[in-house]
């Protein structure tokens, strides 16, 4: 995949975040008046180009990069540490929010099989390791660690996020993807972090579409075959998925399955839905990649 030269990336970021605008925003805070060595431009670009992309993500490494970029003689660790207060965090959030709002979306119409959808939305999450002092706010799954989790839904037509949120590293992806009218007419692509039968049902009930990976141990009841095979193929109707999966050799599985889930969270009342299960054979491993969807064969 093509990657632009570093100089091109730097130029794009500098045009998106002009130095004069950064300084003007910083003057609205009390950091500039209180801290003589505070240089918002050097600090912002250090964060953009050096600290987050480097292998050493300690605050000390960040300080060293900042001193180099700001060309200041020296700066104590304690003074640098004190800059990271709620006011500075709010400033960074304001800069990011305005940048996203002012981006030229360059929306492209979906073509071919995708033109039937209002949009194709990809939901995912990623972990960012933080300085350990932040563990009280951004807890991690491991001990003595701090993690931030970014939850993002991206539009295929624009290449931009439609919604995003940050939480601590322990927060599960599924809890950060609401359902509602926003899914109507859109195809939602989901990874295993969003594997939830109740979620699939809500997307379908709100006139949306979904494609989700399936867990390895999923054992649905097959109620109908949507594609027939010639020869002595194994009949699947009425079988449980795990009972027949290892014996199949066909290139593709295309069946209707049933699944059960709680109709309302914690209510104990169950519901049963029928969805489509598609499997594609990986000839190198001999195993199937399985997907669950409410899309029809057309």
PLM feature spans:
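Adenosine ribonucleotide-centric catalytic and binding domains
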Residues: 70
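Single, function-defining residue in the core of a domain
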Residues: 1-59, 65, 73-74, 84-87, ...
């Amino acid at each position: 995949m093509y990657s632009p030269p570093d100089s091109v990336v730097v130029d794009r970021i500098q045009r998106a975040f002009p130095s004069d605008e950064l300084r003007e925003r910083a003057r609205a805070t009390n950091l500039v008046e209180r801290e003589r060595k505070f240089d918002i431009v050097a600090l912002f670009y250090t964060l953009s180009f050096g600290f987050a992309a480097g292998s050493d993500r300690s605050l000390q490494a960040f300080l060293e990069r900042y001193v180099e970029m700001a060309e200041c003689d020296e700066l104590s660790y304690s003074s640098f540490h004190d800059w990271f207060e709620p006011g500075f965090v709010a400033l960074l959030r304001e800069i990011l929010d305005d940048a996203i709002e002012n981006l030229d979306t360059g929306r492209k119409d979906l073509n071919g099989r995708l033109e039937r959808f209002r949009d194709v939305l990809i939901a995912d999450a990623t972990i960012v390791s933080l300085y350990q002092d932040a563990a009280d706010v951004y807890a991690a799954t491991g001990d003595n660690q701090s993690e931030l989790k970014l939850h993002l839904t991206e539009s295929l037509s624009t290449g931009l996020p439609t919604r995003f949120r940050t939480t601590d590293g322990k927060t599960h992806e599924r809890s950060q993807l609401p359902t509602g009218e926003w899914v109507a007419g859109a195809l939602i692509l989901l990874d295993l972090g969003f594997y939830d039968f109740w979620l699939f049902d809500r997307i379908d009930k709100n006139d949306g579409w979904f494609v989700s990976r399936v867990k390895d141990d999923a054992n649905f009841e097959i109620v109908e075959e949507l594609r027939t095979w010639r020869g002595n193929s194994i009949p699947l109707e009425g079988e449980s998925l795990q009972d027949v999966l290892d014996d199949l050799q066909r290139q593709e599985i295309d069946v209707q399955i049933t699944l059960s889930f709680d109709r309302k969270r914690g209510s104990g009342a169950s519901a049963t839905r029928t969805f489509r299960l598609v499997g594609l054979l990986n000839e190198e491993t001999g195993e199937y990649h399985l997907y669950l969807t409410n899309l029809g064969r057309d």
